Amino acid sequence: MQIFIKESTNKKEWFILDLQGHLEYTGDLKNETLGILTKKPNTKDDFSFQIGNSVLVGKRVPLKKPLLVIKKSKLNNNNNSNNNNKMAVDNKDNKDNEKDKEVEYSIEGICNDKIQFTTRPTTFIPQSSVVYGSPTHKSPSSSPKTISPVKVSPTSSPIKNPEFNN
């Protein structure tokens, strides 16, 4: 069997994402965006990776040995039209068809570094979903929606006609 290798001309920087734990997903991930990987500003090796509402922080680590990223494709050079009408269940003819198919590997890139995420993910809450004025979310002083905290007692509840169990 001959293996043909061709190199693509466009240079891309490839990384391995080294995550601790496991990712759970539903459905097919084919042609889907897994997350957003960004390089932190004013740093050389720090990256952040946002998956859904989780954010991971990692560092760029060089690999001991580089890895080659390749893509396998099958080439069918069978020009004989008599074999096209035969069924694939015929073992003798199926072996002949496999010999006519050649495999080609194209080099997509070389991976020299990995981004290693060693800490647990932090939860990312968009600023628009935070309600200021609650005891858990202190309002910044520059916010126009600043609500001064009001002490609520059973006798001075903001709810109309409150019912309390005594």
Swiss-Prot record:
<dbReference type="InterPro" id="IPR018607">
    <property type="entry name" value="Ctf8"/>
</dbReference>
<protein>
    <recommendedName>
        <fullName>Putative uncharacterized protein DDB_G0287975</fullName>
    </recommendedName>
</protein>
<dbReference type="GO" id="GO:0007064">
    <property type="term" value="P:mitotic sister chromatid cohesion"/>
</dbReference>
<feature type="compositionally biased region" description="Low complexity">
    <location>
        <begin position="73"/>
        <end position="88"/>
    </location>
</feature>
<feature type="compositionally biased region" description="Polar residues">
    <location>
        <begin position="155"/>
        <end position="166"/>
    </location>
</feature>
<feature type="compositionally biased region" description="Basic and acidic residues">
    <location>
        <begin position="89"/>
        <end position="101"/>
    </location>
</feature>
<dbReference type="GO" id="GO:0031390">
    <property type="term" value="C:Ctf18 RFC-like complex"/>
</dbReference>
<dbReference type="Pfam" id="PF09696">
    <property type="entry name" value="Ctf8"/>
</dbReference>
<feature type="compositionally biased region" description="Low complexity">
    <location>
        <begin position="134"/>
        <end position="154"/>
    </location>
</feature>
<feature type="region of interest" description="Disordered">
    <location>
        <begin position="73"/>
        <end position="101"/>
    </location>
</feature>
<feature type="region of interest" description="Disordered">
    <location>
        <begin position="126"/>
        <end position="166"/>
    </location>
</feature>
